[in-house]
Amino acid sequence: MRSLRRVLLQLVLLAGVAFRGVRFDDAADAAAAAQGSSDLFELPSPSPTLALPGGGDEGASTEIIAAPWPGRHGLFTPPRSTSQPARAVVQPAADFGSQLQFYDNGTIQLVDLLSKLPRWQFSTGPPLSKHITTSKPDLNYVIYLDGSETSDLIEVHNGSGVRLPWKLEEFIAETPYIRDSFVTIGSKVSTTFVVNADSGEIIYKHSLPVALNEVGGPLVEEIPSKLDAARSGTSANIIVVVRTDYSISASDLGEHLFNWTRTSFTANYYARYGHQDMLAQSSCLRGNIPCIRTEGPPIKLYLPDSSSDNAIVLRPVNEVSAVDALEPLLPPKKLPQPAGESNVALDSAQNQTADIALGHFVPADTELTNSVTKFSYRWLFPTFLMLLIMACLVKLADASKYCRQFVIRFLKPFMRDEKLMDPRGKSEGTSKRRKARKKDGLINSTQIFSASDKEGNGTGGSTEAQSNKAHDSTNVELPNGLNGRQIGKLCVYSKEIGKGSNGTVVFEGSYGGREVAVKRLLRSHNDIASKEIENLIASDQDPNIVRMYGFEQDNDFVYISLERCRCSLADLIQLHSVPPFSNTKGTDIELWRQDGLPSAQLLKLMRDVVAGIVHLHSLGIIHRDLKPQNVLISKEGPLRAKLSDMGISKRLQEDMTSVSHHGTGFGSSGWQAPEQLRHGRQTRAIDLFSLGCLIFYCITKGKHPFGEYYERDMKIINNQFDLFIVDHIPEAVHLISQLLDPDPEKRPTAVYVMHHPFFWSPELCLSFLRDTSDRIEKTSETDLIDALEGINVEAFGKNWGEKLDAALLADMGRYRKYSFESTRDLLRLIRNKSGHYREFSDDLKELLGSLPEGFVQYFSSRFPKLLIKVYEVMSEHCKDEEAFSKYFLGSSA
């Protein structure tokens, strides 16, 4: 059956080649003869035409065709007759005549080619290109033209770019275009200028779209009188210039991001000779202006030289169909003909088209043919007959298939071997053996799935096992108006909620009555699907990993049903960092405090991410693509961060600490560790590097420690990060600088990060400072005391008494004396005052705040580096002591 279809396809292709070769043979020759390129602009194809019907001979018509001259910028071929097409190629011999030039500032100028002097000029409006960008240094969304010959639109969002499926004009027609919180709008404005080619006077100007108060009114003064003068019988030549401005503007929730304009021109030249009604289009030019141009040659349109007394005959016509405003033409008049011998001259009695010239001409040969006219009669019947035969063969092939199925069903009761019941002629045993030979396929994943359930090891116990075979998908209608597809237990809705790499798309769906997010992957990437399914099963039941409820597959795709979440961490940060939505009253989400520090909610979300990494690393799984877009926020209950998108994750074998140099999957640009960019060995430390970037991203409302997206990878390799923006949070600087260490061996473990002072609660901070004070009060170790006293300059600036309120100084002076230059005395003060907090007066309690939150904030706001500096000293001297081990978990791993 397949061979028969292949033969039919080859017959169709051969018929198409024969059809096209005969039909367009002459057109192809003419196109090859006229092929040329311009270094000024790109001339579109097909070229515009102006049809002039024949006046005396019925059925004959004349057609003027605009097409590029070979090897000439802005020049066009002479017209050809539809009844007797000519193959003449006429080339200019010298630069005589005039030149229409377009400049970047929007000016049009007509220049005499002989004297090189301008004859006239006028402005068409603003400059041809504009590009205005917001002053925001963290612009992470832009749409631009790639500058290639195809002029495709590129959309860049959060460091990743995608080629949009529209051209510029199509994209503007589709606007407004909404992506997340970004709104892009477009406009197209066309302005028409009708200009006297001799004087440069604007006869008429019109722009679309226009304001309502301008509709019906003249856009240029004295337009009616100028139009009357153009029709008064003077031998005026006309140039029609159409300027089209395409503008794109984008904003992010009302805040302007960028806008730019691209301009294109269309110019048409009409010659009026001897009589007011004698008008013909002699040339046409189109050119696209690049969206950003600072300098360069002007765009040119060559006009005919009318200084010659020689003339050729132009046929009379009754109307000009391409220009509605022009009046009927009268009997034939003579146009100026270039000087020289053996030029082409066509008589009006021959019903042929005159060669309306651009510049002077050189001799040319003319050859006429009627092959195009004869085609419709010679090839119409054979083509129809061939199509009829192929349709009959296709129907016959389908009939044979149905007959075969009928025979199999008829003989089914008489068959003893159940293997022969497969209508495809393949036994079930053979199919299973063939499937078992697939490597890294979904079958292996399913077997691993079942094995984990049987072992009862606590991982993946709640996930339902799936069938090895692919299901047939059926379309279903849902009560909420959505359409969907049913694949096994899974229903995939048509509503798309996200996209990923390798053709991955995420849809809304339901699995066994539960709302889920359905991740659809191509079966050609089944190794990615298998890896993600395997690692999701292994990490199931952890609250900080997105749960997988099951998976299904059909002939084309693999569908993974995942826990439905509210949004990604990137979406949450971007939304709440915008002033109208940040810390909005009446909502239960507050990510940053009034002083700009991360709130308890945001600290919990970051701690959830760390907890998820701790769980993966404990199972030997390296995520390898950690970024805000791959961290999801739970939909139900309090905010909780969950790790997702484990398509390129890697599970280490026992006793392994890294992936080889040839490991596949290298994460996302801007979030990869330097060893990933260099394709080196990949250990758990690559997740810690990405975590450092993610923590910085959360604290700074979407900033990145390595700058803008286009420079991040280079700065990561060169270790050029900037933490200045978080300098007011010393604990964050201490942690992030460790996580971004270029040496993976020096990066801390995920367990260490989870217990770092950056994530400590106020109660734990106060407990650590009090335990440290108790420790140094009972010791005579000079090394420890000297180390603590050595941080006084960085911790409080040598005199901590200057930064305390007078009421607190008066209260502490009643009991004992303190040295304002001693770190040990400052820690003693914190320990004593926290222990006697209940004895304070109401005024002093109000000054210090509640215990422990307000109390810790009072001292940390005055001595921001005290906690982290004391932590560094105690980590070096006392981290192995039992009393301090709870503060330094994971630091020695």
Swiss-Prot record:
Subcellular location: Endoplasmic reticulum membrane
Residue numbers on the Cytoplasmic membrane side: 398-893
Glycosylation sites: 105, 158, 259, 351
Annotated binding of ATP, by residue: 497-505, 519
Keyword Ribosomal protein: no
Keyword Membrane tagged: yes
Ranges that cross the membrane: 380-397
Catalyzed reactions: L-seryl-[protein] + ATP = O-phospho-L-seryl-[protein] + ADP + H(+); L-threonyl-[protein] + ATP = O-phospho-L-threonyl-[protein] + ADP + H(+)
Disordered: annotated span: 451-478
Pfam families the record matches: Pkinase, Ribonuc_2-5A
Keyword terms of this UniProt record: ATP-binding, Disulfide bond, Endoplasmic reticulum, Glycoprotein, Hydrolase, Kinase, Membrane, mRNA processing, mRNA splicing, Multifunctional enzyme, Nucleotide-binding, Serine/threonine-protein kinase, Signal, Transcription, Transcription regulation, Transferase, Transmembrane, Transmembrane helix, Unfolded protein response
Assembly with partners or alone: Homodimer; disulfide-linked. Dimer formation is driven by hydrophobic interactions within the N-terminal luminal domains and stabilized by disulfide bridges.
Protein's name according to its UniProt entry: Serine/threonine-protein kinase/endoribonuclease IRE1
Gene: IRE1
